[in-house]
Amino acid sequence: MKIQEFNVGPRFIFGEDAISELSNLSIKKAYIVCDPYMAKSGMVHHVLDHLDQGTVETKIFSGVVPNPTVESISKSISEIRAFKPDTIIALGGGSALDSSKAIILTYTSLEKVSKPTLIAIPTTSGSGSEITSFAVISDLLTEEKYALVDDSLVPDIAILDTVFTMTVPPAVTADSGMDVLTHCLEAYVADGASDFSDACAEKAIVLAWENLPLAYKDGNNKVAREKMHNASSLAGISFNNAGLGICHSLSHAIGAFFHSPHGRINTVLLPYVIAFNSSLSHPTVTPTGSRYAKVASMLQFDFQNEKEGVEKLISGIKQLSAQFGIKGTLDDLGIDKSDFIKHIPEMAERALADACTPANPRKVTKSDLESIYYSLARSI
């Protein structure tokens, strides 16, 4: 048996009005990173209201963009170097959290200073970035996505408060929620999976499966929102330790070229990846297929054998995503079929080199990845 480690990550503060705990933290200079909506909508004031304006100096950077870029990150660097914060507060979805991580890594490298305290306040339930040592940054010039992986990127404190998720639109709720499920299912079968990561993934799968439809139908359902927030962090703990797989690798490459929502891309790819990892076209499934069948059993699907269990899980995922208007085709991603096919060889090359690929349970070739892309292109 190989030697493994398991890291839980940040200090978690969660529950109703968890944001109020900000006032009890030792903060002198806070650099708040968010997108323009968080600033214009007043959502950022939920943070400012709990920072003692008499003793805490604050500065807001609201230049976060979806799928953060090298260019957007660079806009903050001169500002943060002059401000010299002792705390960085990341307020937003995965893009804000990933931006904050890239900012903090760049800032500490340039200034040769100790890392400021990083406080993550997620406003969507999906990326799990509030727990992980990962960040994904795009380069618009090269049309590539880069995965940053460093233990210093794990936030010091994560504040989970549903007040920030109540106004998230249904489509974003669905996309980010399906990203949670993708994280769970990839971590559950990843090479680095363990009893510890499995426990987090299993709980998160059940929470997301039960509560995502409820949060989608009624954004004011506080219980469903809270459970999805918890599921997202549990999934993050799981994949931060176990790893991910080719669903994310394939997704990163598509996102780099076509800029579709990350969670939506994962949603349409996931059934194909499960089938591939299980060798579903063969008479019997792989050991990985047995793991997927265990998930199907957890979700109370009826089946006679493991192959049927995998098929039921795939069918269940398609039915779940259909509730959110996601049919599982390129149309869901707003991508032209001929344009997609033209980019398949290069996307497969990038996916093969992606940081998520090594943890996939079934080892892949470029041809394997191209085959999955072509299967998606043929879907109607």
What are these regions (language model features)?
Residues 1-87, 330-331:
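ATP/NTP phosphate-donor binding region
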Residues 339-380:
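Short, amphipathic C-terminal "tail helix"
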Residues 174-234, 238:
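C-terminal and late-domain segments of enzyme folds
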Residues 16, 22, 40-43, 70-73, ...:
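Short glycine/serine/threonine-rich phosphate/pyrophosphate-binding segments
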Residues 80-123:
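A short, small-residue-rich loop immediately preceding and capping a beta-strand
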Residues 257-260, 264-339:
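Gly/Pro-rich interdomain helix-loop hinge
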Residues 108-195, 286-294:
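A glycine/threonine-rich phosphate-anchoring loop and its flanking beta-alpha core
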